[in-house]
Design a protein with these regions (language model features):
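Bacterial N-terminal signal peptides that target proteins for export
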Residues: 1-13
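C-terminal segment of classical bacterial N-terminal signal peptides
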Residues: 15-25
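Edge beta-strand at a domain terminus
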Residues: 26, 137-167
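N-terminal helix-cap/turn-to-beta initiation motif at the start of protein domains
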Residues: 28-44, 69, 92, 141-143
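Short beta-strand segments that buttress and anchor functional surface loops
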Residues: 47, 75-81, 102-107, 124-131, ...
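Amphipathic hydrophobic-ligand
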Residues: 56-62, 132-134, 160-167
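Acidic, glycine-rich flexible loop segments
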Residues: 110-139
């Protein structure tokens, strides 16, 4: 079943576990570093594709987050599993002036996605994601020390449609 899922869908699922997202850009500072320190560590949990061709597909992911030492940002590395199939996942998000940039896997030029902008506001991060004609956003919210919820939406015509939810 997992092998039938398109890489883009799998990366959207991985984004769900990761954490990221888009508000008005602000210079990355100590409050952003506080958010990334909160995301650092082990994350594991279930998610579900809630729209589209693979609607109803459930998955679990396990990622290790490592906060950047010198600048704001994070690297998440691990895997997601659908049934007995396991797919490696990796995301790198770094401050780039007044925004955030990065990639999942090898970026949009390969089999992954590009993170083209992002912002942290309190316990929430929003990033814009892109791959070919796909545009979307991921919103991650820290809720206490051990809980994070993530929603990934893609742009369909003029609306953002949620496609993946995780908590």
């Amino acid at each position: 079943m997992f092998s039938l899922l398109k890489p883009t869908v799998l990366w959207l699922a991985a984004l769900g576990v990761a954490t990221l997202a888009a508000v008005a850009p602000v210079e990355a500072g100590s409050r952003d570093k506080t958010f990334f320190r909160g995301v650092a560590g082990e994350w594991k949990g279930p998610g579900e594709i809630v729209a589209g061709k693979y609607k109803g597909t459930k998955f679990t992911c396990k990622l290790t987050g490592t906060a950047e030492e010198t600048a704001s940002g994070i690297t998440l590395d691990g895997y997601c599993r659908v049934g007995m199939f396991k797919q490696p996942m990796k995301a790198v998000i770094k401050a780039a002036g007044r925004t955030y940039k990065g990639q999942f896997l090898d970026g949009a030029a390969g089999k992954g996605l590009d993170i083209v902008s992002g912002n942290v506001s309190g316990q929430k991060m929003v990033v814009s994601i892109t791959r070919a004609k796909l545009n979307g956003a991921m919103i991650a919210r820290l809720q206490g020390e051990n809980t994070m919820t993530v929603t990934i939406s893609v742009k369909v015509e003029d609306q953002m449609v949620p496609v993946i939810g995780m908590s």
